[in-house]
Amino acid sequence: MSAGGDFGNPLRKFKLVFLGEQSVGKTSLITRFMYDSFDNTYQATIGIDFLSKTMYLEDRTVRLQLWDTAGQERFRSLIPSYIRDSTVAVVVYDITNLNSFQQTSKWIDDVRTERGSDVIIMLVGNKTDLADKRQITIEEGEQRAKELSVMFIETSAKTGYNVKQLFRRVASALPGMENVQEKSKEGMIDIKLDKPQEPPASEGGCSC
């Protein structure tokens, strides 16, 4: 396996598991990050899907292993084994679906049952493009994250809003990144994804 430019150093791998209720946008967030695309036709994830992405950070290269889990009840028994050796849990809810938000506490409890405090947890409120149907305010999301001592961000997989920032913030919190965070207090790490450079012109939607 290639070290992707980190000659003499094995490429560090970090496992990110995406959790949340059905149709909150877990697969769409991964697809936006991996391919910068969005598919309007919804297809439920069956069981567990796995994708891998190399990220070139300021001072090193890491490989993110993205595990996309099914939200349906019938697949719940599979999920703990995937949480068990994860570095990061990304718990996603739909800002237009109150139940999906309420269930985030249960998902985070599941993560802590399997991993204790030895895990980074990011709470993500997805579908900000549907602001007119919003049921959970950003303040409520921030408050929930504060109560549960986890990170928080809102995103739109459809427009791409904050998706890169989500992964930047996760990357800045990875084990061994403390020295980079010191140099980069705002977590604004220069991340080059392993795909051709995008033209500097329009990027479609907000590129925050």
Curated annotation (Swiss-Prot):
Regulated by guanine nucleotide exchange factors (GEFs) which promote the exchange of bound GDP for free GTP, GTPase activating proteins (GAPs) which increase the GTP hydrolysis activity, and GDP dissociation inhibitors which inhibit the dissociation of the nucleotide from the GTPase. GO terms for biological process: Golgi organization; intra-Golgi vesicle-mediated transport; intracellular protein transport; neuron projection development; protein localization to Golgi membrane; retrograde transport, endosome to Golgi; retrograde vesicle-mediated transport, Golgi to endoplasmic reticulum. Its main location: Golgi. Its cofactor is Mg(2+). The modification Cysteine methyl ester is found at residue 208. GO terms for cellular component: ciliary basal body; cytoplasmic vesicle; cytosol; endomembrane system; endoplasmic reticulum-Golgi intermediate compartment; Golgi apparatus; Golgi membrane; nucleoplasm. SUPFAM superfamilies: P-loop containing nucleoside triphosphate hydrolases. GO terms for molecular function: GTP binding; GTPase activity; myosin V binding. It comes from the Eukaryota. Pfam families: Ras. InterPro entries: P-loop_NTPase, Rab, Small_GTP-bd, Small_GTPase. A motif (Switch 1) lies at residues 39-49. Keywords: Cytoplasmic vesicle, ER-Golgi transport, Golgi apparatus, GTP-binding, Hydrolase, Lipoprotein, Magnesium, Membrane, Metal-binding, Methylation, Nucleotide-binding, Phosphoprotein, Prenylation, Protein transport, Transport. It is an enzyme of class 3 (hydrolase). Mg(2+) binds at residues 27, 45, 68. NCBIfam families: small_GTP. Interacts (GTP-bound) with BICD1 (via C-terminus); the interaction is direct. Interacts (GDP-bound) with DYNLRB1. Interacts (GTP-bound) with APBA1/MINT1 isoform 2, also called Mint1_826, but not with isoform 1. Interacts (GTP-bound) with VPS13B isoform 2. Switch 1, switch 2 and the interswitch regions are characteristic of Rab GTPases and mediate the interactions with Rab downstream effectors. The switch regions undergo conformational changes upon nucleotide binding which drives interaction with specific sets of effector proteins, with most effectors only binding to GTP-bound Rab. The small GTPases Rab are key regulators of intracellular membrane trafficking, from the formation of transport vesicles to their fusion with membranes. Rabs cycle between active GTP-bound and inactive GDP-bound states. In their active state, drive transport of vesicular carriers from donor organelles to acceptor organelles to regulate the membrane traffic that maintains organelle identity and morphology. Recruits VPS13B to the Golgi membrane. Regulates the compacted morphology of the Golgi. Seems to have a role in retrograde membrane traffic at the level of the Golgi complex. This is Ras-related protein Rab-6B. It comes from Homo sapiens (Human). The lineage of its organism: Eukaryota, Metazoa, Chordata, Craniata, Vertebrata.
